[in-house]
Amino acid sequence: MDGIFKNSTSFNQSLTNWDTSNVTDMSEMFKNATAFNQNISNWDVSKVTEMHYMFQNASAFNADISLWNTSSAQNMTYMFLNATSFNQNIGDWDVSSTAPSTGGLEGMFSGASSYSYSVKKWCVSNFSSAPADFSTGSQLNNSKLPQWGVCPSRATLIITTSDVDNVIYSGSDLSITANFSEAMQGTPSIKITTGGLNA
């Protein structure tokens, strides 16, 4: 799919139902597609290795792609170059497969003048220093940048209960306390299921 909508300056059609589960190359896909701003949040990009220049000059694009599985991405060079409207929180993306030898993250947010979300939790252990032009012209300051050469540990959750004998009777109340190892953004959702209960 590399370059499929490149230079399509009027294109702004829905692509929500596209099956992208076997796609490996999305490089330059929306390069210079200056009108495109559609919901592609549900795309399966888990096999995509090439994302370089994907949204270059896609000046209208500001769709939420925060839940994309980018764990296979190796090359995100200039991905949002001059994507001047883009400002979605992609701080939880997995970029651990990128490295300088594969193009990596050079110029990723260069000229993305609206982008302001922190990416400090990114795992960038393959980079000994900041890639060239990584955030030039964006709103990313030092406090929002990754710690180059480091893969931060993920937040942990510890759940404790007031039930000391591990026996819960029908209709009884159980007090559960959840402690996160770091501040959570928004409201975390915790689902507790039961199993192995005898009637």
Language model: regions and residue ranges:
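Negatively charged
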Residues: 2-154
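Generic beta-strand hydrophobic packing signal
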Residues: 127, 162, 187-190
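Cys/His-enriched low-complexity segments
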Residues: 134-135, 166-168, 180
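Serine/threonine-rich, repeat-prone extracellular segments and beta-strand-based repeat modules
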Residues: 147-150, 164, 196
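Short, solvent-exposed loop/edge segments of extracellular or virion-exposed proteins
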Residues: 155-169
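Short, surface-exposed alpha-helix to beta-strand junction/turn motifs within ectodomains of secreted
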Residues: 174-199
